[in-house]
């Protein structure tokens, strides 16, 4: 949501940003994502196979929260913009900073480190603060830490990293080189899992237009 960034107001780069363009870009990306799922469901239906119905969970982050913050700071915007503008039909939508526990693993855009609400800065600290397996985004690089609880069960804290195909203007040449990809969790059992990173370069090589 670059148009609502309070950090860039007054900068030359802020010129030309529009809320409607931000929403349209996000909704178009979501449409592309959902089309892949619907295409697979249609394929299975034609072959009379069990339909794949994944549980879809969307944890609102600080960029989506800019919408609510803008309305809160300027009452004239009430009714003109809201998170309802985002095309999230079919998703379970979690409010900003509200965790959700699935199979013993806590997920949130980020986890706070204390009463001030600042984000936990690394995976090891996340385990120390929350004492359970946790997965979060927010930061620009991946990080992972492991521990065991008093019962001897494994705990994993994961910073998922980014999923970009491009360089971001707000990052520098070093941070733009961060690992980009997604994660698959296998053998999930009450907070324990085997994590499998899948890089963007691997996905593009296997499923891209030139593969």
Can you say where each PLM-predicted feature lies in the sequence?
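Short secondary-structure boundary segments
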Residues: 1-4, 85-99, 187, 191, ...
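Core catalytic region of metal-dependent phosphoesterases/phosphodiesterases
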Residues: 1-88
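Charged, low-complexity C-terminal accessory regions
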Residues: 40-53, 66, 70-145, 149-151
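Conserved beta-sheet core of the metallophosphoesterase superfamily
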Residues: 108-200
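Polar, enzyme-active/binding microenvironments
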Residues: 200-210
């Amino acid at each position: 949501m670059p148009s609502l960034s309070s950090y860039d107001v007054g900068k030359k780069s802020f010129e030309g940003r529009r809320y409607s363009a931000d929403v349209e870009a996000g909704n178009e990306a979501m449409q592309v994502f959902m089309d892949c799922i619907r295409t697979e469901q249609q394929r299975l239906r034609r072959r009379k196979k069990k339909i794949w119905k994944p549980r879809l969970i969307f944890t609102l982050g600080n960029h989506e929260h800019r919408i609510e913050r803008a309305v809160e700071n300027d009452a004239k915007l009430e009714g003109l913009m809201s998170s309802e503008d985002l095309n999230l039909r079919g998703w379970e939508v979690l409010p900003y900073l509200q965790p959700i526990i699935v199979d013993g693993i806590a997920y949130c855009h980020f986890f706070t480190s204390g009463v001030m609400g600042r984000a936990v800065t690394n995976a090891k600290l996340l385990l120390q603060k929350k004492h359970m397996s946790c997965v979060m985004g927010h930061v620009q690089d991946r990080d992972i830490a492991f521990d065991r609880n008093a019962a001897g069960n494994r705990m994993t804290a994961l910073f998922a990293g980014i999923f970009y195909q491009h360089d971001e203007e707000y990052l520098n040449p070093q941070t733009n080189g961060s690992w980009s990809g997604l994660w698959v969790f296998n053998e999930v059992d009450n907070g324990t899992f085997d994590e499998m990173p899948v890089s963007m370069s691997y996905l593009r090589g296997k499923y891209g237009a030139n593969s």
